[in-house]
Amino acid sequence: MRTYENIMIVHPDKVADEYNAVVEKFKGVLTDLNANLLKVDEWGVRKLAYPVKKQGRGSYVLTVFEADPTIIDEYERRLRLDEAVIKFQTVLLEKGFVEEAAAAAEEGANAEEEE
């Protein structure tokens, strides 16, 4: 299994219930495809660098997961078909990246506690 990071931008006009339904739907898709969810981080609504599908803002969702490389095409196909998702990108993380990031975050938290 490899570690992947996916960022998706959800249409900004979706109300909270619809937005949560989209996020839960794609968590379920990953689970159905036998992926292990490591992290789901909702960044909220942010301004886009350039308009995408005539939208200047979007709700960002970052997902980190472990999966077989064979499921990525199916996952991205489902993202492409959902009208609520206006843009997405999935990247393969280097081996050990998740552990290094967790260690760095822990060191940062310890430094803040000492101050």
Swiss-Prot record:
<comment type="function">
    <text>Binds together with bS18 to 16S ribosomal RNA.</text>
</comment>
<dbReference type="Pfam" id="PF01250">
    <property type="entry name" value="Ribosomal_S6"/>
</dbReference>
<dbReference type="GO" id="GO:0022627">
    <property type="term" value="C:cytosolic small ribosomal subunit"/>
</dbReference>
<keyword id="KW-0689">Ribosomal protein</keyword>
<protein>
    <recommendedName>
        <fullName>Small ribosomal subunit protein bS6</fullName>
    </recommendedName>
</protein>
<keyword id="KW-0687">Ribonucleoprotein</keyword>
<comment type="similarity">
    <text>Belongs to the bacterial ribosomal protein bS6 family.</text>
</comment>
<dbReference type="GO" id="GO:0070181">
    <property type="term" value="F:small ribosomal subunit rRNA binding"/>
</dbReference>
<dbReference type="GO" id="GO:0003735">
    <property type="term" value="F:structural constituent of ribosome"/>
</dbReference>
<dbReference type="InterPro" id="IPR020814">
    <property type="entry name" value="Ribosomal_S6_plastid/chlpt"/>
</dbReference>
<dbReference type="InterPro" id="IPR035980">
    <property type="entry name" value="Ribosomal_bS6_sf"/>
</dbReference>
<dbReference type="InterPro" id="IPR014717">
    <property type="entry name" value="Transl_elong_EF1B/ribsomal_bS6"/>
</dbReference>
<keyword id="KW-0699">rRNA-binding</keyword>
<dbReference type="InterPro" id="IPR000529">
    <property type="entry name" value="Ribosomal_bS6"/>
</dbReference>
<dbReference type="GO" id="GO:0006412">
    <property type="term" value="P:translation"/>
</dbReference>
<keyword id="KW-0694">RNA-binding</keyword>
